[in-house]
Amino acid sequence: MNFRPLHDRVLVRRVAAEEKTAGGIIIPDTAKEKPQEGEVIAAGNGTHSEDGKVVPLDVKAGDRVLFGKWSGTEVRVDGEDLLIMKESDILGIIS
């Protein structure tokens, strides 16, 4: 992939939504919500503090993250639909 986010931006691939509920009910495509969970594909170098130093991001490529329902901007990179968002849009890292 030839894309590198700048500053505090993060490139995220959504994970596939569940096909069935815990009770075994199959969810049709029309009823599925966009997942709010994804994998970090690439991350910027970080933000600049007031004294000019780079503050690195807490997330890195490979992290599984949760983000807000309306977070990020959809982009198409190498034929794949991805999200680019600020690190502050990420709610947490799933371990």
From Swiss-Prot:
CDD domains in UniProt: cpn10
Main location: cytoplasm
Cystine residue pairs: none
Listed name of the protein: Co-chaperonin GroES
Family membership noted in the UniProt record: Belongs to the GroES chaperonin family.
GO BP of this protein: chaperone cofactor-dependent protein refolding
Compartments, record wording: Cytoplasm
One GO MF term: protein-folding chaperone binding
The keyword DNA damage is assigned to this record: no
Name of the encoding gene: groES
Cited function: Together with the chaperonin GroEL, plays an essential role in assisting protein folding. The GroEL-GroES system forms a nano-cage that allows encapsulation of the non-native substrate proteins and provides a physical environment optimized to promote and accelerate protein folding. GroES binds to the apical surface of the GroEL ring, thereby capping the opening of the GroEL channel.
HAMAP family from the UniProt entry: CH10 (MF_00580)
Keywords: Chaperone, Cytoplasm
Subunit description: Heptamer of 7 subunits arranged in a ring. Interacts with the chaperonin GroEL.
UniProt-listed Pfam families: Cpn10 (PF00166)
Sequence intervals crossing the membrane: none
Gene Ontology CC annotations of this record: cytoplasm
